[in-house]
């Protein structure tokens, strides 16, 4: 049938699945200036990155003068006594556990793609399990941090920057070992306005237009030229700032599309133990 919408912003797994299943039109990359203009993780036959957002460690700089700097610190309840908070589910939790166990970011999905790697991640989660408060919605971790219920948490970078700005908090982000994900523009299959939709995506993807986004919300920019043009005062809060991107890991949507069902079952069984 004819879709109700022409252009939609989708998360990484939705992009992977929808493109494979023929739900989206193929993009005209010539209109976008070529694939090399964008972060590699922002490039797909059916979609182009719209925003980049990260999940990272956050802590209250007013309460912890010397905060954590790594996932090993997040797991170290002797050095940093108190509860921690993680997003409920295997996605992110398993990657963070492997990094806490010494796996370099670039090798996380290689390790996690083996049965031994999955066992290793769950074994590492076992260590922290008594100290974890699980969160499910994006507002929860910052509420837990503000109330003092947890000493550190994972959280979305845009939320952290937003509450610092709106409520004068001093929540700090630990960028090394953060995981960034990209939401992408797609055109729904059989859109009657395909050409206009492509023109809109091209307009939204131009560096001079993307560069305005961080003034309103601390999302990173998939267009490399736009990311480099962000004013210095705003760069520190963005996943795409060069120093923040350097130690970060791109979410592997293909891995999660292939493994989410099985790992969800295992995670839920583990949680119930």
Where are these regions (language model features)?
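Solvent-exposed, polar/charged alpha-helical surfaces in well-ordered, non-transmembrane soluble domains
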Residues: 16, 72, 119, 123, ...
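A bilobed periplasmic-binding-protein/Venus flytrap-type ligand-binding module shared by bacterial periplasmic
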Residues: 54-63, 98-100, 182-196, 212-216
């Amino acid at each position: 049938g004819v879709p109700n919408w022409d252009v939609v912003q989708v998360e990484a797994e939705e992009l992977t699945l929808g493109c494979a299943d023929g739900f989206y039109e193929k993009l005209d990359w010539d209109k976008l200036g070529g694939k090399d203009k964008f972060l590699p993780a922002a490039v797909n036959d059916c979609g182009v990155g719209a925003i980049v957002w990260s999940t990272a460690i956050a802590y209250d700089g007013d309460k912890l003068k010397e905060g954590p700097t790594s996932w090993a610190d997040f797991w170290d309840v002797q050095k940093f006594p108190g509860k921690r908070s993680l997003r409920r589910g295997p996605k992110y939790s398993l990657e963070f556990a492997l990094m806490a166990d010494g796996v370099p970011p670039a090798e996380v999905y290689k390790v996690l793609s083996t049965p031994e790697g999955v066992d290793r991640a769950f074994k590492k989660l076992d260590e922290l399990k008594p100290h974890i408060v699980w969160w499910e919605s994006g507002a929860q971790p910052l509420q837990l941090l503000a109330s003092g219920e947890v000493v550190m948490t994972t959280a979305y970078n845009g939320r952290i920057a937003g509450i610092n700005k709106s409520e004068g908090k001093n929540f700090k982000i630990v960028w090394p070992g953060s995981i960034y994900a990209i939401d992408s523009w797609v055109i729904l299959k059989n859109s009657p306005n395909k050409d206009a939709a492509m023109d809109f995506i091209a307009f939204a993807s131009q560096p001079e237009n993307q560069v305005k986004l961080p003034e309103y919300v601390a999302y990173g920019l998939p267009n490399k030229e736009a990311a480099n043009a962000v004013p210095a005062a705003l760069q520190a809060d963005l996943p795409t700032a060069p120093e923040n991107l350097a130690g970060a890991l791109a979410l592997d949507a293909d891995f999660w599309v292939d493994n989410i069902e099985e790992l969800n079952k295992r995670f839920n069984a583990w949680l119930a133990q």
